[in-house]
Amino acid sequence: MARVTVQEAADKIGNRFDLILTAARRARQLQLHVREPLVPEENDKPTVIALREIEKGLINGSIMDQLENSDAVRQEVAEQEAISFLTDIQTNAYFYSFNDG
């Protein structure tokens, strides 16, 4: 079991309130497997891993903002590609049904 000193993690972030917000955001990423842990998992829960990452200075609020922004851009690109793909399928289906009829 990992020992995490909340005070050390709070000192890295600035205060306990921002620590809770940052740790919750990071733990959610880890829980949903959106991002891989930056420290060994050691059979710890996502919240403990998030706190360990913060304590080591690997994660903070601005890093979380950057990660979430890049994830949002990646998601938007994937959605646009899916829309384009579906539009192509519909166009081709219409073309073939028009030429067959």
UniProtKB/Swiss-Prot annotation:
Cysteine-cysteine disulfides: none
Keyword Nucleotidyltransferase: yes
Gene3D superfamilies in the cross-refs: 3.90.940.10
Top EC class of this enzyme: transferase
Catalytic activity entry: RNA(n) + a ribonucleoside 5'-triphosphate = RNA(n+1) + diphosphate
A GO MF term: DNA-directed RNA polymerase activity
Source species, domain of life: Bacteria
Keyword RNA-binding attached: no
Entry GO terms, CC: DNA-directed RNA polymerase complex
GO BP annotation list: DNA-templated transcription
Pfam families on file: RNA_pol_Rpb6
Keywords: DNA-directed RNA polymerase, Nucleotidyltransferase, Transcription, Transferase
EC numbers for this chain: 2.7.7.6
Family as reported in the entry's similarity comment: Belongs to the RNA polymerase subunit omega family.
Subunit structure: The RNAP catalytic core consists of 2 alpha, 1 beta, 1 beta' and 1 omega subunit. When a sigma factor is associated with the core the holoenzyme is formed, which can initiate transcription.
Function: Promotes RNA polymerase assembly. Latches the N- and C-terminal regions of the beta' subunit thereby facilitating its interaction with the beta and alpha subunits.
Name recorded for this polypeptide: DNA-directed RNA polymerase subunit omega
Organism: Haemophilus ducreyi (strain 35000HP / ATCC 700724)
Organism lineage string: Bacteria, Pseudomonadati, Pseudomonadota, Gammaproteobacteria, Pasteurellales
